[in-house]
């Protein structure tokens, strides 16, 4: 094989990650931010090149999937085509499933971050930085480890505080800031109630009550 067969398998495995070369696609609105989500620094994520789950070194901004699947939001499953083909990101342009060398070379280089895109928005960027500091995965991982040790009660309390703050800041920017709810996963990453499953944590929420258990 030396050309794309339009099978759509690469699109069904998840949308691309963005690099600095893609910045204008977002800033000019060709790919609106509400269709994106952020894998935050330190978060466990699947490395598509190495084929394993590992903490990421920096923000990774990606296109959301369709509903509960990883299929890229812009993939037309009936026509087996891309809705943004002419303005597709760098990773989509260099990907050749029969020869992944070019993708492997650019995969971890010059990744686009939230700071690149929204650090100039006063107030909002302060909230993002505060959220990143208080919900840092480098703080969360030791607490998860301590859940099975002598420090488990303190660890559980601290972890619940972080999870509650993560939920509260999202509600706050919607109710008081009038922010579009679809922007939350881009600005603050995915909710901890979703991502902590990768760390073996099961979270159950009933109203304002949150319960967490080890799987």
Give residue spans per PLM region.
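Hydrophobic scaffolds flanking metal-cofactor catalytic centers in soluble metalloenzymes
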Residues: 1-215
């Amino acid at each position: 094989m030396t050309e794309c067969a339009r099978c759509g398998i690469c699109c069904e495995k998840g949308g691309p990650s963005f690099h600095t070369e893609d910045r204008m696609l977002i800033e000019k609105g060709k790919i609106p931010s509400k269709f994106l989500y952020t894998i935050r620094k330190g978060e466990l994520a699947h490395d598509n090149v190495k084929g394993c789950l590992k903490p990421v070194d920096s923000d990774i901004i990606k296109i959301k999937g369709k509903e509960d699947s990883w299929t890229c939001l812009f993939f037309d499953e009936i026509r087996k085509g891309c809705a943004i083909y002419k303005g597709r990101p760098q990773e989509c342009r260099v990907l050749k499933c029969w020869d992944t060398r070019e993708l492997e070379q650019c995969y971890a280089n010059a990744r686009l971050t939230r700071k690149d895109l929204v650090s100039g928005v006063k107030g909002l960027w302060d909230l993002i930085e505060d959220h990143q500091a208080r919900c840092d995965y480098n703080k969360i991982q030791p607490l998860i480890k301590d859940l099975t040790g002598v420090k488990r009660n303190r660890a559980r309390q601290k972890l619940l505080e972080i999870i509650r703050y993560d939920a509260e800041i999202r509600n706050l920017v919607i109710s008081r800031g009038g922010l579009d709810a679809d922007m939350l996963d881009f600005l603050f990453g995915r909710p901890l109630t979703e991502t902590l499953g990768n760390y073996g944590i099961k979270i159950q929420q009933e109203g304002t009550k949150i319960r967490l258990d080890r799987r």
